[in-house]
Curated annotation (Swiss-Prot):
Function according to Swiss-Prot or TrEMBL: Cell wall formation.
Broad class of where this protein is predominantly found: cytoplasm
Gene Ontology BP annotations: cell wall organization; peptidoglycan biosynthetic process; regulation of cell shape
Species of provenance: Synechococcus sp. (strain CC9605)
A GO-annotated cellular component: cytosol
Binding residues annotated for ATP, in chain numbering: 173-228
Gene: ddl
This protein's name: D-alanine--D-alanine ligase
Textual note on the cofactor: Binds 2 magnesium or manganese ions per subunit.
Amino acid sequence: MPSSPITVGLVFGGRSGEHDVSIRSAATVVRGLRSGENTERYTVQPIYIDRDGRWWGTDLAEATLTSEVAPELTTPRPPSGFQGFPEGCDAIDLWYPVLHGPNGEDGTIQGLFQLTGKPFVGAGVLGSAVSMDKQAMKSAFSSAGLSQVPYVALHASELEDAKSRSALLDRIERELNYPCFVKPANLGSSVGISKVRSRQELEAGLEQAAALDPRLVVEQGVNAREVECAVLGRRTLEASVIGEVRFDADWYDYETKYTAGRSTTLIPAPLPDPVRDRIREQALQACAAVGVHGMSRVDFFYDETNDQLWINEINTLPGFTAQSMFPMLWAASGVTLEQLVHKLIQTAGE
């Protein structure tokens, strides 16, 4: 145990659509850092980023963590965006980002932390950026030989005129069958995703996604179980037990993910041991393919009728809310919340 506590700069909130989820995740992480032996190991210095990108120091950050909702900000306010670190940040020994979506898990803030010369929890710039962009991620998975559902990658510019739009719709319908899913390439938590069953719905879904991100992906829908594996470590990666998500909805959208009672998690997932082993092995392969270390949650589709396993995506800053798989998977693997956040900080220093 260190002679003096390590000061952890816990950064949360952010400009993405997952702002509220980040607050709830951060509150859980802080509980872990302020419990048991961690109270002697760490001093937590929270930093809140508001929806306009302003960085706020300890007083507002602590109040936000206590309420677990975004605060009402006073006026006049400082200019929006990053204007420098809040007072007292020079004492921070290590950064712990609890940020979801753009500017949080896409390599942006990881680059800022790297410039400070201090270690930080989670994946680095490259792994974060590749994992956040679904087009880049899918290319990396393909190069690693990992099976994926059929998909079409495209750019919003292909929707700009009637001729190219029609050609795009024709190409998607030629390569994929309905239903399919239209996704912005760089958003998380199912934000901006739509399930489409016709050409009219496809066109509307593309318009909706293109308003959020110029890079888009359309994926073939499959009738499969949704299973997940958590990964932890830096020099040596460990894979958790496997979990399964079952939900009371047509698909696993944002509301279903974050509304209590709308989804059910089965941990461990009721799967044959050989299938569990394949999932764990492919989760580690996925991390290697995109250059991810620290922590991640890797999501798969499994069709038990033909024993087909497809990798879906990797999340480099998975949620830590009450409904979040990552901490629950590790708890089922024998790692408590207190131990988990400690391990994550240890990996940052390796």
